[in-house]
From Swiss-Prot:
Any Pfam family matching the protein: 60KD_IMP
Membrane topology label: Multi-pass membrane protein
Cysteines engaged in disulfide bonds, as pairs: none
Chief place of localization: membrane
Protein's gene: yidC
GO biological process: protein insertion into membrane; protein transport
Protein name: Membrane protein insertase YidC
TM annotation in the entry: 8-28, 386-406, 460-480, 505-525, 549-569
Protein family membership: Belongs to the OXA1/ALB3/YidC family. Type 1 subfamily.
Alphabetical list of InterPro entries matching this protein: Membr_insert_YidC, Membr_insert_YidC_N, YidC/ALB3/OXA1/COX18, YidC/Oxa/ALB_C, YidC_ALB_C, YidC_periplasmic_sf
Cellular component annotations (GO), alphabetically ordered: plasma membrane
Function of the molecule: Required for the insertion and/or proper folding and/or complex formation of integral membrane proteins into the membrane. Involved in integration of membrane proteins that insert both dependently and independently of the Sec translocase complex, as well as at least some lipoproteins. Aids folding of multispanning membrane proteins.
Length: 614
């Protein structure tokens, strides 16, 4: 009885953990996402622009202590135009790499047109490709900008500057050189290079042919107009992100940055980190990001800001380097980088290693339990490259974990088998001391000690699943490698729920089942394996416990209907391995397997009920 209660409490606890976790992390934020969608649409429909669609420069740009320019309030209000029309406002240099395509506008020289060649909006290759960066003037401006700020230096490059280009294509191995003369003795040159993935290298040079020295501060920024529609999950950070030297990782949601004190000007809030060496700043989505990366050996000031212009929120992450003094007839240069692309784990790690970018791997939100999620991903990725299928990798990693935890599980199942072997003695003790609970418990403990039985050993197989379950869930949820990763048959995306539904006979009926009753094939398979696993043991003598155990497979089947298919496949496979393992151990210890008797008993009860009604 004690063991049955313990198992029941553990099962209920696990159910509550999963149910509450799912509500807190997934269903709870659904209303928040809807609210954000409305706000985002409103903001996009009223995005402020200047007459030519480019944000006006701040009147404080000349001050070396001012925030870097780029996205500032005060522009004349004008509705957004189509992305294509916004791109057509300026002559452009084409970007073409194996991973990216887009363009750089010669007006402002912003990197503001980037799409990802290898990623589509849906699993269909015919669906539109992912658009990451878009120009000012469009409905969703999102871009990177590089330049200089300074006092008493004359005109400096800004969003209205018309640059001259030495070519019409930016590609790997084919850098682009842009030049602009301010007419007062300063010649600005910008050399932009791009690799075959997602990294731009920007070298800004300034030549001083005037009679006076000038002091300039190099900057780079990533700017996003309007609050985007985020996933809204608490297990995932979306918003402003960066690593700021010894201050480490900084993550600010779109709401949080607006609650910071005033910074640098009217209608602007934010936070700055001064005298930082090593790091980066950017804006991240679930799968994509744009990040400005300064020279890792030179100090800089990093900042996160939110600026308000009418109904529009303008979010910006920026870095500003220390002062550079350029003497007459001298020149100076600074090199910065821009990451703009998909958060591929191995590529992010390679950039951190090869370019020496401080903690660039934190671009991916591994969470507090990174020591579980990272090894889980590495194992899945290893077998994926070996087998070519992430679904098969999940099955294989689950099998390896079963083998790894075999000693613990074996002791648990052996103890459970011994518990069943002494079931008659336990029943006798309960009958003998049914009126004295204290003596009953003492007799039970003596029996456990005599037979070397651990009454809570049966909890371990369940408890072991909890960290594995959440580690796999995190990997499926955050890593782009799992996005649109197929399994077999109808599973084309392991990171999405099983698309089939019993409510429309798995697609035979011409309607879509509502999400709250969506129940696919794999959740049903999982429920069946869980049902079989529970029928391996005799039914608890307590009717309440028996009902709880009877309904648990049904509850979990419906609950996991909205979980990622990869997670449901893991659970079903893990249940199957547990049944096989428990069956072998019970037979080895001479304990009767109750599965067939329990199944026959169900049918007999069903026949008796039918006969009674007849």
């Amino acid at each position: 009885m004690g063991n049955d209660k313990t198992n029941m409490f553990v099962a209920i606890a696990l159910s509550l953990v999963v149910l509450l976790g799912w509500h807190y992390f997934v269903t709870g934020p659904a209303s928040e996402r809807q609210r954000q969608a409305v706000q985002s649409q409103t903001a996009q429909n009223t995005a402020p622009q200047s007459a030519d669609g480019i944000p006006s420069p701040s009147p404080r740009e000349g001050s070396p202590n001012a925030p870097v320019p780029g996205t500032v309030p005060g522009a004349a209000a004008q509705g957004p135009i189509s992305r294509e029309d916004a791109l057509a406002r300026s002559a452009r240099v084409r970007i073409d790499t194996p991973a990216l395509y887009g363009s750089i506008g010669l007006k402002g020289a912003r990197i503001d047109d980037v799409s990802l060649k290898n990623y589509h909006e849906t699993v269909s290759d015919e669906s539109p490709r992912i658009v990451l960066l878009s120009p000012a003037g469009s409905a969703n401006p999102y871009y990177a900008e590089f330049g200089w700020v300074g006092a008493n230096a004359g005109p400096l490059p800004n969003g209205d500057t018309l640059w001259k280009a030495d070519g019409d294509l930016l590609a790997p191995g084919k850098p682009l050189t842009l030049t602009w003369d301010n007419g007062q003795g300063l010649l600005f040159k910008r050399i932009v290079a791009v690799d075959d993935k997602f990294m731009f290298t920007v070298r800004d040079e300034v030549e001083n042919s005037s009679a006076n020295p000038v002091t300039l501060y190099p900057y780079s920024l990533v700017s996003r107009w309007g609050k985007p529609q985020t996933q809204g999950y608490y297990v995932l950070h979306e918003g402003l992100i960066g690593v700021l030297g010894s201050d480490g990782l900084q993550e600010y949601t779109y709401d949080k940055v607006g609650k910071e004190p005033a910074y640098g000007g009217a209608a602007t809030q934010g936070k700055a980190w001064s005298n930082v060496t090593g790091g980066w700043v950017g804006i991240t989505d679930k799968y994509w990001a744009a990040a400005a990366i300064p020279d890792q050996d030179k100090p800089f000031t990093g900042a996160f800001t939110e600026r308000t212009d009418g109904a529009t929120k303008i979010y910006q992450t920026s870095v500003r380097g220390d002062a550079v003094t350029v003497a007459p007839s001298a020149s100076s240069a600074t090199t910065q980088r821009l990451f703009a692309g998909a958060k591929e784990v191995n590529q992010i790690n390679a950039y951190e290693r090869d370019l020496g970018i401080k903690q660039f791997d934190l671009m991916i939100d591994w969470g507090w339990f990174w020591f579980l999620t990272k090894p889980m991903f590495r194992a899945l990725d290893f077998f994926y490259h070996l087998l070519g299928n992430f679904g098969v990798s999940i099955l294989l990693v689950t099998l390896i974990l079963k083998i790894f935890f075999l000693p613990i599980a074996n002791r648990s199942y052996v103890s459970m088998a011994k518990m069943k072997a002494v079931q008659p003695e336990m029943t006798s003790i309960r009958e003998r001391y049914k009126d004295d609970r204290t003596k009953q418990q003492q007799a039970m403990m003596e029996l456990y000690k005599k037979e070397k039985i651990n009454p809570v050993a049966g909890c371990w197989p369940v408890l072991i699943q909890i960290p594995v379950f959440f580690a796999l869930y995190k990997v499926l949820f955050i890593t782009i490698e799992m996005r649109h990763a197929p399994f077999f048959g109808w599973i084309h995306d392991l990171a999405a729920p099983d698309p089939t539904s019993i409510m429309n006979l798995f697609g035979l009926l011409p309607f879509a089942a509502p999400d709250f009753i969506h129940l696919g094939v794999w959740p049903i398979i999982m429920g069946i394996t869980m049902f079989i696993q529970m029928k391996m043991n005799p039914a608890p003598p307590d009717p309440v416990q028996a009902q709880v155990f009877a309904f648990m497979p049904i509850v979990f089947t419906f609950m996991l209907g909205s979980f990622p298919a990869g997670l449901v496949i893991y659970w079903a496979w893990n249940n199957t391995l547990s049944v096989i393992q428990q069956y072998i151990i019970m037979r080895r210890n001479g304990v009767k397997v109750e599965l067939w008797d329990n199944l026959r008993g169900m049918f007999k009860r069903g026949n008796k009920s039918a006969a009674a009604k007849g």
